[in-house]
Every structure is written in structure tokens, then in C-alpha cells.
């Protein structure tokens, strides 16, 4: 996982390591041992000159990043793998789905084939540390700069987390009690 608020986009590599399946450890459990294959995938990606890894599940579908959920935009539709695809459920993922729906962006949870990420209009990952990070290259396939849907959702997310989005003020709780 990484924090990319200051970066324009990141490169990613589809890892040779697979996401741990639901029949091994419940994928919804945020268990420390479950992150081992994510660490291996991340190291593999970095050794190959990429900033992030994308893991496939046991069926060969896109699951998630090394510590992030993944979203793909094609023809204006935002797609993310379903929970049944052995993904790690994420609060940031749920937030982006809710924001997209508020913004009138069609959202679907659907299995994503490896080739779909190469030919997507936009790809981004989300997570507590990554927040909303555009992906501009996957396995030497250039996707280009962050697209309009990614920028729109990223901007809205950043405004919310900075306390500058009145529409979502009830989403925030200030630790100092104010």
C-alpha cells in the first residue's frame, strides 16, 4: 500500500502471486497472515520497476492491489470486483461506490478479466493509505493520465477527507470532539 495524494498516477504490474482464496482464509478478514502474498506481489512489482501490484484471484480474475481495491472505467461505467471474487472489503471502496452513485456514475460489481484492465479507459485503486490513486500503466500497457471519472471521484474524496464537502459533512467525526 502507498499514499499517492501528491503523485499524479502510479504504474502497476499484474503479479505472478494470486490473491488468497475464500476457501483458504476468509477474504473479508483483515488478518495479518493474509497480507503475506500481497507483500510478495508488491516486492515483485517494485523489482520489475512498477509502483504497485495487481493480484488475480484463483479463477484468474482481477481481485485487488497489494493493499488496495481496484476500479476500472470503461465507456463511462465504473466496475469493481465483487466481494465474492476474494477481495478484501474496504471502507474506501464502499465510499467510492457511494460517491459514484451520488454523482450519477453507473456502478457495477462484476468479475474483471485481465485483458479488461489493459483496455480500460481508466483504472484506479483505493485504500486507507492509497486513498484514490490513478493507475496510468499496467504491464507496459499505457493508460494515459487520470481520466475524468477518476479525477471527479478523487477530487470529491479529497474534499470530504479535508472537511470541505458540505454534502458529506455527516461522514466525518473529528477526533477532538468538535
Regions flagged by a language model, labelled:
Residues 1-178:
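Helix-start/capping segments and mature chain N-termini
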Amino acid at each position: 500500500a502507498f499514499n499517492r495524494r501528491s503523485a499524479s498516477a502510479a504504474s502497476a504490474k499484474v503479479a505472478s502471486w494470486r490473491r488468497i482464496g475464500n476457501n483458504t482464509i476468509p477474504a473479508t478478514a483483515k488478518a495479518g497472515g493474509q497480507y503475506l502474498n500481497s507483500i510478495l506481489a508488491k516486492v515483485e512489482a517494485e523489482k520489475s520497476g512498477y509502483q504497485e501490484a495487481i493480484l488475480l484471484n484463483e479463477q484468474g480474475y482481477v481481485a485487488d492491489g497489494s493493499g488496495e481495491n481496484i476500479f476500472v472505467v470503461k465507456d463511462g461505467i465504473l466496475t469493481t470486483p465483487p466481494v465474492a471474487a476474494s477481495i478484501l472489503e474496504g471502507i474506501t471502496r464502499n465510499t467510492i461506490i457511494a460517491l459514484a452513485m451520488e454523482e450519477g456514475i453507473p456502478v457495477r460489481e462484476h468479475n474483471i478479466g485481465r485483458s479488461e484492465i489493459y483496455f480500460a479507459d481508466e483504472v484506479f485503486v483505493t485504500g486507507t493509505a492509497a486513498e484514490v490513486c490513478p493507475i496510468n500503466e499496467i504491464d507496459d500497457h499505457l493508460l494515459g493520465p487520470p481520466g475524468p471519472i477518476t479525477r471527479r471521484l478523487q477530487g470529491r474524496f479529497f474534499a470530504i477527507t479535508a472537511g470541505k464537502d458540505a454534502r458529506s459533512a455527516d461522514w466525518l467525526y473529528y477526533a477532538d470532539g468538535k
